[in-house]
């Protein structure tokens, strides 16, 4: 290190300089001293890294005071093999002892493999991707729940190990990190049963080429015409036409054949070649024709006597309808008033319950929400009471 030091005498003021004779001594010459000093030891260079913040990412405040970023909560599912250690973890969670003295910790060796320590035992674990997303909820009063996170990964503890580094001995493939099942029994092999496989690019290109070919043929055609045909209607029409042909042939055979009551063999031979459905349809059609002929033959003699009886019945029915209308209106009013009273009683009990929840709530947001519900239900209660007055018994 070089140190430079300059020492100079301050010149006198102007008045004294003018009073000094020209024959006086010359002004002094400044002296310069240079001192060199060797460094005591190597000096370390300090490098300070500052993260570049992207606008809009994280907690980006314009305040002058330094503020910490908000915490981002990330959750995974821990699955242990059944046994004493699994029950130990379950009881620790129920008693809220995790992180407060319970002998439980998790240490990740890499991005996918980890070590789970439970009650003095080590387990090898791997982090797998679930086939679906699971919502995690939390509650402060065991009444209202709030969504906390979306879970898409699970840490599976497989077997016990003696040392932490033993988990790195097993080589896993990329397919081992894709979990094929869900969390519940109905979601077993869900990736193969419910998720459709991705269509290859060759199939998509083949379909696009076929569409282009058909469009090119349409452009080269002199005239085109199209017609929309419903497949269900087409199948229905074909089945109706087939049944009509079968019934026509069957009825022609019935009319052209004489059946003797004493000779039952002729009847059995005729129906041997028919299906049960065709036979039932033919019998039903014959019965309909017979009943229609019978109604036509008996309707003519009764027509004259029924005209006078029908007029008397119509008059009696009109009188009964007028009486029933008055009774129906009274019954409807009573029924409506009963329903309104039941709704009012339920609404009053709900208002009391909400007011009690508002008094017991410690969170101001929940308390304001309960009070807003109370105000809404009070307004609805007043409206229902006016409806009860408008419909007296």
UniProtKB/Swiss-Prot annotation:
Keywords: mRNA transport, Nucleus, Phosphoprotein, Transcription, Transcription regulation, Transport. GO terms for cellular component: cytosol; nucleus; transcription factor TFIID complex. SMART domains: TAFII55_N (SM01370). GO terms for molecular function: RNA polymerase II general transcription initiation factor activity. The keyword tRNA processing does not apply. Residues 292-305, 331-340 have a biased composition (Basic and acidic residues). Residues 1-43, 253-273, 290-340 are annotated as: Disordered. It holds the Pfam family TAFII55_N. Belongs to the TAF7 family. This is Transcription initiation factor TFIID subunit 7. It comes from Schizosaccharomyces pombe (strain 972 / ATCC 24843) (Fission yeast).
């Amino acid at each position: 290190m070089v140190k430079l030091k300059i020492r100079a005498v301050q010149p006198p003021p102007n008045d004294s300089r003018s009073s000094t004779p020209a024959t006086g001594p010359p002004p002094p010459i400044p002296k310069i001293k240079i001192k060199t000093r060797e460094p005591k030891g190597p000096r370390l260079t300090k490098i300070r890294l500052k993260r570049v913040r992207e606008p809009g990412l994280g907690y980006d405040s314009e305040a002058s005071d330094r503020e910490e970023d908000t915490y981002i909560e990330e959750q995974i599912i821990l699955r242990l093999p059944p046994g004493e250690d699994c029950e130990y973890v379950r009881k620790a969670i129920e008693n809220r002892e995790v992180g407060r003295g319970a002998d439980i910790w998790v240490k990740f060796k890499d991005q996918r493999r980890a070590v789970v320590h439970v009650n003095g035992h080590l387990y090898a674990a791997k982090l797998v991707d679930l086939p679906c997303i699971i919502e995690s909820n939390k509650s402060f009063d065991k009444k209202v729940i709030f969504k906390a996170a979306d879970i898409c990964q699970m840490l599976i503890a497989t077997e016990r190990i003696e040392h932490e580094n033993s988990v790195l001995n097993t080589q896993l493939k990329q397919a081992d990190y894709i979990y094929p099942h869900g969390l519940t029994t109905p979601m077993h092999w869900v990736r193969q049963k419910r998720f459709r496989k991705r269509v290859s690019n060759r199939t998509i290109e083949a379909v696009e080429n076929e569409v282009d070919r058909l469009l090119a043929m349409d452009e080269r055609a002199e005239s085109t015409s199209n017609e929309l045909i419903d497949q269900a209607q087409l199948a229905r029409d074909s089945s109706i036409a087939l049944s009509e042909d079968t019934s026509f042939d069957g009825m022609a055979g019935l009319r052209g054949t004489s059946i003797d009551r004493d000779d039952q063999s002729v009847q059995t031979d005729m129906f041997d070649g028919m299906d049960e459905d065709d036979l039932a349809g033919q019998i039903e059609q014959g019965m309909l024709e017979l009943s229609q002929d019978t109604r036509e033959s008996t309707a003519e003699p009764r027509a004259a006597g029924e005209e006078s009886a029908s007029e008397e019945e119509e008059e009696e029915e009109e009188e009964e309808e007028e009486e029933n209308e008055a009774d129906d209106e009274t019954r409807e009013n009573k029924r409506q008033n009963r329903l309104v009273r039941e709704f009012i009683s339920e609404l009053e009990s709900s208002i009391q319950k909400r007011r009690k929840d508002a008094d017991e709530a410690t969170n101001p947001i929940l308390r304001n929400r309960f009070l807003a519900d109370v105000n809404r239900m009070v307004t609805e209660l007043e409206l229902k009471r006016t409806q009860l007055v408008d419909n007296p018994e």
